[in-house]
Amino acid sequence: MPPTAPPEKMMFQLTLRRRGISDQAVLRTMEEVPREEFVLPADRAEAYRDSAMAIACGQTISQPFVVAYMTEQLKLQKNHRVLEIGTGSGYQAAILSRLCANVLTVERFRTLADKARERLEKLNCFNVEVMLGDGYALPPGAGQFDRIIVTAAMDQIPQSLLDRLEPDGILIAPVGPQHGVQTLVRVTRTGDHFDRKELVDVRFVPAIPGIAREL
């Protein structure tokens, strides 16, 4: 980090390291992507606080540590194709875009999808495609993915989503009740077998099937 970095950004990086984030590529990317571009204007001064924040459509931008942790758990490589379910502000997609080949991110709210697309284009994240759609029902032509990240809580991970994983692919998702504590789960595909590992407790907004009729 440059010695002239604002104190809040220096504390931001220190917090991530203290909480166990060690992947240098992830840390560098978290430093480079300006979180203030993804929060509401009234929250820009608090953009580097390690907490989730409200955005439009009753959704949230995730806590920076959780973004970094989930990204680290994906074990991304530069040639990977990544699917994100739940674009939200676009912040997670911006982080992913710097660590893989391309990202397809799916959002059910048109307002969020349009704003995220604008932000990502502004930051030259041209390897990200923002799709207005239903993360539970991807079109057949969407194809397979090396990594899948879900940023809203599911009661269970649908097999149709697991089947989108390439061999040796990894999926990470919060699983549990819609209103309460969920468990972050990492699933690794080996052939037709799926190994599941529970990681940490988290709180996410619920994943809802379908495309929002309003907003």
Curated annotation (Swiss-Prot):
Disulfide bonds: none annotated. GO terms for molecular function: protein-L-isoaspartate (D-aspartate) O-methyltransferase activity. The keyword Lipoprotein does not apply. It holds the Pfam family PCMT. The active site is at residue 62. Its main location: cytoplasm. It is found in: Cytoplasm. Keywords: Cytoplasm, Methyltransferase, S-adenosyl-L-methionine, Transferase. It catalyses: [protein]-L-isoaspartate + S-adenosyl-L-methionine = [protein]-L-isoaspartate alpha-methyl ester + S-adenosyl-L-homocysteine. InterPro entries: PCMT, SAM-dependent_MTases_sf. Its EC number is 2.1.1.77. GO terms for biological process: methylation; protein modification process; protein repair. GO terms for cellular component: cytoplasm. Belongs to the methyltransferase superfamily. L-isoaspartyl/D-aspartyl protein methyltransferase family. Catalyzes the methyl esterification of L-isoaspartyl residues in peptides and proteins that result from spontaneous decomposition of normal L-aspartyl and L-asparaginyl residues. It plays a role in the repair and/or degradation of damaged proteins. This is Protein-L-isoaspartate O-methyltransferase. It comes from Bradyrhizobium sp. (strain BTAi1 / ATCC BAA-1182).
